[in-house]
């Protein structure tokens, strides 16, 4: 595919096409299935809810800075209300007193909506195996992506975001109520830990934590 640049002064002049009609159509038209086009728009325009619980939230917010630039992935539009968001990142320790609030906020989010569990505390309770902490946010919320770490680096959060976008792009959701009742077909969720186990077992050079 070739593109031509012209000066602003010559914008009024129409350049004669030097290719065939098929080439002109190929440069100006895009053909796709409606379902694939909608999924492409959803995965590239996630609106996170500005919500955090504890220290992992600091790492999440760091991903919005210029160094990591989450805007590259179309997820920089932070919403201050759950009614305008479609992504909730559970970043931090989930206390039992906070669980009903989190569930209520989740219910107010737009459909379709997704959840990222960020950090060991949100994934499994972390080091707080006590009566006041929920041992995993998936006890009361459906989780789409788990990001391990205590706390995870912004790079890990961005990788989790990319995994979520990949899964959203493969989802098949109903486009109209007039077609009839339809379910949501989700892509399988592979475990990256299992996929990378063989590669990690072959590692012979181990870097210090300040070099990771």
UniProtKB/Swiss-Prot annotation:
Keyword Transmembrane belongs to the record: no
Superkingdom, taxonomy of origin: Bacteria
Main enzyme class: translocase
Keywords: 4Fe-4S, Cell inner membrane, Cell membrane, Iron, Iron-sulfur, Membrane, Metal-binding, NAD, Quinone, Translocase, Transport, Ubiquinone
SUPFAM superfamilies per UniProt: HydA/Nqo6-like
Membrane topology: Peripheral membrane protein
Cofactor: [4Fe-4S] cluster
Cofactor note: Binds 1 [4Fe-4S] cluster.
Region (Disordered): 179-212
Gene Ontology CC annotation, any one: plasma membrane
Subcellular localization: Cell inner membrane
Biological function: NDH-1 shuttles electrons from NADH, via FMN and iron-sulfur (Fe-S) centers, to quinones in the respiratory chain. The immediate electron acceptor for the enzyme in this species is believed to be ubiquinone. Couples the redox reaction to proton translocation (for every two electrons transferred, four hydrogen ions are translocated across the cytoplasmic membrane), and thus conserves the redox energy in a proton gradient.
Family: Belongs to the complex I 20 kDa subunit family.
The protein's name: NADH-quinone oxidoreductase subunit B 1
Organism: Nitrosococcus oceani (strain ATCC 19707 / BCRC 17464 / JCM 30415 / NCIMB 11848 / C-107)
Source taxonomy: Bacteria, Pseudomonadati, Pseudomonadota, Gammaproteobacteria, Chromatiales
């Amino acid at each position: 595919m070739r593109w031509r640049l012209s000066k602003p002064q010559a914008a009024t002049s129409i350049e004669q096409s030097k290719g065939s009609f098929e080439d002109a159509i190929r440069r100006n038209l895009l053909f796709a299935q409606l379902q694939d086009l909608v999924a492409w728009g959803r995965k590239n325009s996630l609106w996170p809810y500005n919500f955090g619980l504890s220290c992992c939230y600091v790492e999440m917010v760091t991903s919005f800075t210029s160094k990591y630039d989450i805007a590259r992935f179309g997820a920089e539009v932070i919403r201050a209300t759950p009614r305008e968001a479609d992504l909730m990142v559970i970043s931090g320790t989930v206390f039992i007193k906070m669980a009903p609030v989190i569930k209520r906020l989740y219910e107010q989010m737009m459909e379709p909506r997704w959840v990222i569990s960020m950090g060991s505390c949100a994934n499994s309770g972390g080091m707080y195996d006590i009566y006041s902490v929920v041992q995993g946010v998936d006890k009361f919320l459906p989780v789409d992506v788990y990001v391990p770490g205590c706390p995870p680096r912004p790079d890990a959060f961005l990788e989790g975001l990319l995994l979520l976008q990949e899964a959203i792009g493969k989802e098949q959701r109903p486009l109209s109520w007039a077609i009839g009742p339809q379910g949501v077909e989700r892509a399988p969720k592979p475990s990256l830990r299992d996929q990378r186990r063989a590669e990690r077992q072959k590692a012979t050079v181990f870097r210090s934590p300040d070099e990771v």
